[in-house]
Amino acid sequence: MNIFAAFEERIGEALASLTRAGQLPEGLDLGRVVVEPPRDPSHGDLATNAALVLAKEARTNPKALAERLAAELRSDPRVTEASVAGPGFLNLRLAPQVYGDVVRAALRAGEAFGRGAKQPGLVNVEYVSANPTGPMHVGHGRGAVFGDALANLLVAAGREVVREYYINDAGAQVDVLARSAFLRYREALGEEIGTIPEGLYPGDYLKPVGAMLAKTHGRSLLGKPEAEWLPLVREAAIGAMMERIREDLAALGIRHDVFFSERTLQEGGKEGGEGGAVARLIEALRARDLVYVGRLPPPKGQLPEDWEDRDQTLFRSTAFGDDIDRPLLKSDGSYTYFASDIAYHASKVERGATELIDVLGADHGGYVKRMQAAVRAVSDGRASLDVKLCQLVRLLRGGEPVKMSKRAGEFVTLREVIDEVGRDPVRFMMLYRKNDATLDFDLAKVVEQSKDNPVFYVQYAHARTASVFRQAREAFPGEDLSAEALAGADLSLLTDSGEAEIMRLIAQYPRVVESAGSAHEPHRLAFYLYELASAFHSFWNKGKDLPQLRFVNQTDRMSTLSRLALVAALRGVLASGLGILGVTAPDEMR
């Protein structure tokens, strides 16, 4: 039961009634009409912008239109007050039984409460896609958690989702990985390697790869030229790094449906030549006159060292909203990263995706326009791309920066953080700030048992709901406390302002799932859960001072059952929301 969607429909009916009465023209576009909680709860339960967005089209004054709508809605038995505020906002106050109906609906729907109806189209969410050249760091962890929670959120909102990881296994960086692993192979055979040469990957994480190569090949690789050992070592090193990455992701509860290898885009053909997926893609674009040979103007400001004033093979990305056309081939004839990226996103479209979401690091800001243009081109406008950039994570301990990891060589690994504080704090706190804002992750604060630690505060609320039911079973042995039985309780007894606040927030849950999913912003759900937990803890504390407001009262069975119905509905929402974020909902805090 989504009261916001229900009242959007009701406002549509009211507008239709005014149209039939000749007070409004026909064919008004209701696409921008929104029903949402008012910014100030004292103004009512619902607010709508209907009059503001429709007044011009209706050729009337926003305030006058709002007054007409208010008059129509006052006859609705669910509405106790309809008032106009400001330039034409319409605020509605609802009858208490509306919230009682929401609690009953939540109890009867169980896990389905707040979930959206199935929607058409396939969403491809690509996240993590860390280069297989070393351990994952906490920045990778933020993108991993964001992407996984977003995928969960979209599923909850009714979307079909494919979760994808792009393995960057075709670039120069994997050759550097192979040379770094070969150095560790020589070390494993007893050679003194000294300081790691500049340009190779430092850190101890490649030592096991070197040991594995030594065990498998003995000394047989030492006398071979690089051209012979490099492909073999590269394959082994990529495999070992991807195995480690998968283990780290599993420790964080992250899963993917597809691991897509960049190398497969070039299989069957030579770089810059015929046969591979990238080459076929370029030829298909050329056939549509979207590829040409030309010269790019020099970039503004200081010229990059690698900029060349020469004829280049260019993609007409400006035809699809980009700032400049983009090169597809390097001066040596090999593909640019952009060319491979176009082919990769074309593959997503070919596999049925109509909505593409890429979760990337903040350093990919320049990537957005060109890839959105590319997706429009390869899909003929049938697919869209949203790029979500995750800002940096500053790792702190008690407010002080954390030193680098010796094992990784230059950063603290994600696994080190998970092992220290646990999966739940990592996941929740990575989502408790909008993705495009820098995140301070304090290893000391995320394990504190206080209101200032959001993950503890929300999980503690769920644990408290479980303790309420343990008390209730002791106080009322034999009483049917199932959700179905509690849905029959007299919810008109829930008259305290604290109870009303909890019911108001429960009613918002379906809208939060829907809006957070459509905006691709899982932090909205994390914020909502903290607000809901706060309302519950506040009412719990109120009962300490006022015994008549306690959840379980042995001398008042009726009010106890009413409050248990409220607690059961709240517990279901907390568990559902935490589940979407990938965080456990404990019955006891340990």
Curated annotation (Swiss-Prot):
InterPro entries: aa-tRNA-synth_I_CS, Arg-tRNA-ligase, Arg-tRNA-synth_N, Arg-tRNA-synth_N_sf, ArgRS_core, DALR_anticod-bd, Rossmann-like_a/b/a_fold, tRNAsynth_Ia_anticodon-bd. Monomer. GO terms for molecular function: arginine-tRNA ligase activity; ATP binding. Belongs to the class-I aminoacyl-tRNA synthetase family. A motif ('HIGH' region) lies at residues 130-140. PANTHER family: ARGININE--TRNA LIGASE, CYTOPLASMIC, ARGINYL-TRNA SYNTHETASE. HAMAP family: Arg_tRNA_synth (MF_00123). It is found in: Cytoplasm. Its main location: cytoplasm. Keywords: Aminoacyl-tRNA synthetase, ATP-binding, Cytoplasm, Ligase, Nucleotide-binding, Protein biosynthesis. This is Arginine--tRNA ligase. Its EC number is 6.1.1.19. GO terms for cellular component: cytoplasm. Gene3D superfamilies: Arginyl tRNA synthetase N-terminal domain, HUPs, Isoleucyl-tRNA Synthetase, Domain 1. NCBIfam families: argS. It catalyses: tRNA(Arg) + L-arginine + ATP = L-arginyl-tRNA(Arg) + AMP + diphosphate. The keyword NADP does not apply. It comes from the Bacteria. Signal peptide: none annotated. GO terms for biological process: arginyl-tRNA aminoacylation. The gene is argS. It comes from Methylobacterium nodulans (strain LMG 21967 / CNCM I-2342 / ORS 2060).
